[in-house]
Amino acid sequence: MERIAVLAYSGGLDTSCCLKLLEDKYGYKVVSVCVDVGQPEEEIKEVEEKAKKLGVLKHYTIDAKEEFVKDYIFRAIKANAMYEGYPLSTALARPLIAHKVVEIAEEVGAEAVAHGCTGKGNDQFRFETTIRIKAPHLKIIAPIRDLNLTRAEEIEYAKEKGIPIPTESKKYSIDENLWGRSIEGSELENPDFVPPEEIYAWTKNPVEDKEEEIVEIEFKEGVPVAINGEKLEPVELIKKANEIAGKHGVGRIDIIEDRIIGLKSRENYECPGAVLLLTAHKALEQLVLTRDELRFKEIVDSLYGELIYKGLWFDPLREDLDAFIDKTQERVTGTVKVKLFGGTARVVGRDSPYALYSKELVSFDEKEIDQKELAGMVKYHGLQAMLYEMRKKRK
């Protein structure tokens, strides 16, 4: 009986070497899986062709774009999910990819699943945690990490096995899905190196933006449903948000990020649609939620982002947090106007049938609130600080 390993396959050097290593070093027949979460269409086709040329038993291409948006991105929006200023585009997709790989592994009766992650990055945690949660009986193999291979050793092995290598090695490592694009490697590893314009593909150079644009985002119970009055299907809405914000240079992110294992890394991202939608969503929450709800939700949102980053999407705590978040989102319905210009996204208007803002109460020209009645409240505001100061003076 054939021993089968299912490989999460991207078509890059790491996973292509994994494919052959699984055959040579581990004795497996390989089934490859590419999960489409918004990569370029031509890349998806190239991956399939390459897998077949390298002799896989079978290759699966799974279109998971709609599931990614509805079950992952929309939940991240409702949670204002960020990690150290980054909208979690790469991290958010990994549990879904790993879950799909597990489903194929169970379908084909595989003994093992494999990935091409190295030992220094975050993805090893994200893939393996999901796999162990969903299918603890499956063996996990990470050839690049487990064999401690360097990039040079991988290239040498690829030449030996006839794995196609571009004549010019890719300068940067790029990961792309509907929620964003990450660029790393080469000179970008120097935190003082100024990124060249060539690394960007989704966003226009902000200094070249000559005309501002006001875009209106409509939300229903925390989920974006329309842009500029046009109702859009989930995948199309995210694509549209990326397109509109990207042409104004919105969503360029350059940060020093704390990885799971403790390393600090320099990361560059393009997340135009994410920045636009998260900015609008947060503004609408400020209009409809109470002060105490907002304060507590900030804590929940921060924890939610950390769970995503650490690969704990399927942890029960995430479901618990969703229960609270979903309750708050019942009133997050309305529209937000965002001005886009020169790399910035600035909220300039918001409206909701659930708004807690009252023009009559807040206006200096109205008498809905009897100002005299506030004197007593003001008198005892900061009472503990006053008592503390009195005690100090007695000493």
From Swiss-Prot:
HAMAP family: Arg_succ_synth_type1. Keywords: Amino-acid biosynthesis, Arginine biosynthesis, ATP-binding, Cytoplasm, Ligase, Nucleotide-binding. Belongs to the argininosuccinate synthase family. Type 1 subfamily. NCBIfam families: argG, PRK00509.1, PRK13820.1. L-citrulline binds at residues 86, 122, 126, 173, 182, 257, 269. PANTHER family: ARGININOSUCCINATE SYNTHASE. It is an enzyme of class 6 (ligase). Its EC number is 6.3.4.5. GO terms for cellular component: cytoplasm. The gene is argG. Homotetramer. It catalyses: L-citrulline + L-aspartate + ATP = 2-(N(omega)-L-arginino)succinate + AMP + diphosphate + H(+). Pathway: Amino-acid biosynthesis; L-arginine biosynthesis; L-arginine from L-ornithine and carbamoyl phosphate: step 2/3. L-aspartate binds at residues 118, 122-123. Pfam families: Arginosuc_syn_C, Arginosuc_synth. ATP binds at residues 8-16, 116. It is found in: Cytoplasm. GO terms for biological process: argininosuccinate metabolic process; L-arginine biosynthetic process; urea cycle. Its main location: cytoplasm. One of its GO terms (molecular function) is argininosuccinate synthase activity. This is Argininosuccinate synthase.
